[in-house]
Amino acid sequence: MDKKAIFDSVSNMEEQIGELYQQLGDLKTNLGEMLEENNRLNLENEHLRRRLSLTDEGTLEPVAEEEAVHGVMAPNRKEAMQQMIELGEGYDNLVQLYKEGFHVCNVHFGSPRGNDEDCLFCLSLLNKK
């Protein structure tokens, strides 16, 4: 092979590597978005399962039409929600999410933490309890 052919071959490889790097970056972005969405859906699913179990137990009334349409809670529902909040379930959920490698701070909420590095914002939030 002459020098020009070798140079062209190396240039071609460089372009291919650049394209692969771009594809890898796109895949990484898509994966991050999918992880965030999966996390959000898991939380929503868990919340709905708890709500269903509370409804089945009679602790929580089914959602009234007014609440569904206008976002206004019935008085009994407010009391039940207040009891759940007082139990610290939300805090426990945040701790679990943080242990699973996700941000719980308002700056990066739901996004994966890189290499399980600690986030000062998350830690300050979790230590407020």
Curated annotation (Swiss-Prot):
Cofactor binding note: Binds 1 zinc ion per subunit.
Any GO BP: DNA replication
Residue sites binding Zn(2+) per the record: 103, 105, 119, 122
GO cellular component, one term: nucleoid
Pfam families, alphabetized: YabA
Keywords: Cytoplasm, DNA replication, DNA replication inhibitor, Metal-binding, Zinc
InterPro entries: YabA
Similarity field: Belongs to the YabA family.
NCBIfam families: PRK13169.1-4, PRK13169.1-5
Role, per record: Involved in control of chromosome replication initiation. Inhibits the cooperative binding of DnaA to the oriC region, thus negatively regulating initiation of chromosome replication. Inhibits the ability of DnaA-ATP to form a helix on DNA; does not disassemble preformed DnaA-DNA helices. Decreases the residence time of DnaA on the chromosome at its binding sites (oriC, replication forks and promoter-binding sites). Tethers DnaA to the replication machinery via the DNA polymerase beta sliding clamp subunit (dnaN).
HAMAP family tied to this protein: YabA
Name by which UniProt lists this protein: Replication initiation control protein YabA
Species assigned in the record: Listeria welshimeri serovar 6b (strain ATCC 35897 / DSM 20650 / CCUG 15529 / CIP 8149 / NCTC 11857 / SLCC 5334 / V8)
